[in-house]
Swiss-Prot record:
InterPro entries: Ribosomal_bL28, Ribosomal_bL28/bL31-like_sf, Ribosomal_bL28_bact-type, Ribosomal_bL28_sf. GO terms for molecular function: structural constituent of ribosome. It comes from Cyanothece sp. (strain PCC 7425 / ATCC 29141). This is Large ribosomal subunit protein bL28. The keyword Ribonucleoprotein applies.
């Protein structure tokens, strides 16, 4: 499974690791993804999602149903 947030679509970023002598090598900055079980009140069940920690904070603010609607995700498939 690819390392992509299921709600925000956030994925890895290409960057440079810069040494003291300023030599640059490419590195991958991965997203901080967590598996999370979230109670879905409208579906009356738990939904297991792979979310970035930024999405978890936004989820507490917006709520699961409205956040999934914004992202265009059908929660019945999870």
């Amino acid at each position: 499974m690819s390392r992509v947030c299921q709600l925000t679509g956030k994925r890895a970023n290409n960057a440079y690791a810069v040494s003291h002598s300023h030599r640059r090598t490419k590195k991958l900055q991965e997203v901080n993804l967590q598996w999370k079980r979230i109670w879905w009140p409208q579906g009356k069940r738990w939904v297991r999602l792979r979310l970035s920690t930024k999405a978890l904070k936004t989820l507490e603010h917006k709520g699961l149903d409205s956040f999934a609607r914004e992202a265009g995700i059908d929660l019945n498939k999870f």
